[in-house]
Amino acid sequence: MEGSKRKHESRRPQQEQEQHRPRTPPSYEEIAKYGHSFNVKRFTNEEMCLKNDYPRIISYNPPPK
């Protein structure tokens, strides 16, 4: 049950964050600065280090284009 609660809580702030955030893609400077954390932030709504939570980063599958 805790897992489902966690999912529900992380969904609400994600929607709020996306409303305030402009819909433009990140600039090259931002990509170089933050690198991989963009996808991680979208998935878990928090910045993570690769070495801290590597399996969770692997589990992220970006939607097919």
Swiss-Prot record:
UniProt xrefs under Pfam families: Orthopox_F8
Family label: Belongs to the orthopoxvirus OPG052 family.
Organism: Variola virus (isolate Human/India/Ind3/1967) (VARV)
Record keywords, A-Z: Early protein
Up-regulation conditions: Expressed in the early phase of the viral replicative cycle.
Domain of life from the UniProt record: Viruses
Composition bias type Basic and acidic residues, residue spans: 11-21
Renumbered residue ranges of the record's region Disordered: 1-29
Bias-annotated ranges (Basic residues): 1-10
Protein name, entry field: Protein OPG052
